[in-house]
């Protein structure tokens, strides 16, 4: 299987997001990398499902609450920017203050 660098990166985000989901299900708090991966995956999959940029910017802010992440992670993640492909082209989705307080 020959994957491009972009495809490899997308797969790594997906795997990290799956790990984060399993840890949340066990009641564990997420670290920085897990939180970013989970929110990033939400945006990528939402774009794949045909959702609008504005809708994804809002819904991504509801993926995680402050009580689901380790102490300080909410302040470390000020903005997440994800370049994703929509039916009408590639766009940069910016999610400000992505962890719900």
Curated annotation (Swiss-Prot):
Catalytic EC class: hydrolase
**What GO molecular function annotation could you give as one example from this UniProt entry?**
nickel cation binding
Query: Keywords for this entry?
Result: Cytoplasm, Hydrolase
EC number(s): the record gives 3.5.1.5
Localized where?
Answer: Cytoplasm
Q: Which Pfam families does the record match to this protein? A: Urease_gamma
The processes (GO biological process) annotated in the record are:
urea catabolic process
Gene3D superfamilies named among the record's database cross-references: Urease, gamma-like subunit (3.30.280.10)
Q: Pathway, according to UniProt?
A: Nitrogen metabolism; urea degradation; CO(2) and NH(3) from urea (urease route): step 1/1
Catalysed reaction, written as an equation: urea + 2 H2O + H(+) = hydrogencarbonate + 2 NH4(+)
- InterPro entries recorded: Urease_gamma, Urease_gamma/gamma-beta_su, Urease_gamma_sf, Urease_subunit
Q: Which GO terms describe its cellular component?
A: cytoplasm
Subunit record text: Heterotrimer of UreA (gamma), UreB (beta) and UreC (alpha) subunits. Three heterotrimers associate to form the active enzyme.
- Family designation: Belongs to the urease gamma subunit family.
Q: What is this protein called?
A: Urease subunit gamma
Which species does the entry assign this protein to? Ureaplasma urealyticum serovar 10 (strain ATCC 33699 / Western)
Q: Which gene encodes it?
A: ureA
């Amino acid at each position: 299987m020959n994957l491009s660098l972009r495809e490899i990166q997308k797969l790594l985000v997906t795997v990290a997001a799956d790990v984060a989901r399993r840890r949340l299900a066990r009641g564990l708090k997420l670290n920085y990398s897990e939180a970013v991966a989970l929110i990033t995956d939400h945006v990528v999959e939402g774009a794949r499902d045909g959702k609008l940029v504005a809708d994804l910017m809002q819904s991504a802010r509801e993926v995680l609450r402050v009580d689901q992440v380790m102490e300080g992670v909410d302040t470390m993640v000020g903005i997440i920017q994800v370049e994703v492909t929509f039916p009408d082209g590639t766009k940069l989705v910016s999610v400000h203050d992505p962890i719900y307080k």
